């Protein structure tokens, strides 16, 4: 499986649970990137997330031949950019990446659980968690294939 496919499938984890919570009044002036704790905090969440996925027998087959170092770097850049940080994601679009993979809601749901677990492990606040998932949410239609 190509790295771009794996990167895209990992993003699935962020998009199913998209929420609509608003940031608190005091945090509205800071970017989501800053409220998440910057690149270091995003890197820590991604590290935990990829570990969770690797241990998840429901979906870890997607990652069997993946270069995890590259995967993590792509995920960090994607989250960093999506949250208003200075990074740039340069991978393929989610639609291109997932074409023909047959991703269904079951795999998507498993990744959501793994991502939420990683966010919770790092004590990401509910507002920030919901906002991040909401920013990434529109990608779902490009990832999950219709039956």
Predicted regions and their residues:
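Core of compact, soluble alpha-helical bundle domains
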Residues: 23-147
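Positively charged n-region of N-terminal signal peptides that target proteins for export
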Residues: 1-5
């Amino acid at each position: 499986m190509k790295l771009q496919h794996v990167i895209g499938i990992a993003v699935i984890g962020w998009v199913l649970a998209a929420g609509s919570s608003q940031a608190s009044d005091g945090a509205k002036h800071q970017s989501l990137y800053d409220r998440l704790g910057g690149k270091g905090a995003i890197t820590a969440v991604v590290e935990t997330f990829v570990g969770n996925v690797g241990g998840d027998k429901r979906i870890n087959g997607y990652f069997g031949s993946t270069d995890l170092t590259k995967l993590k770097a792509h995920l960090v850049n994607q989250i960093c950019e999506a949250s208003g940080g200075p990074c740039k994601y340069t991978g393929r679009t989610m639609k291109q990446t997932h074409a023909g993979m047959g991703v269904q809601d079951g795999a998507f749901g498993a990744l959501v659980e793994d991502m939420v677990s990683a966010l919770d492990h790092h004590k990401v606040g509910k507002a920030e968690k919901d906002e991040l998932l909401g920013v990434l949410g529109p990608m779902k239609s490009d990832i999950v294939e219709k039956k």
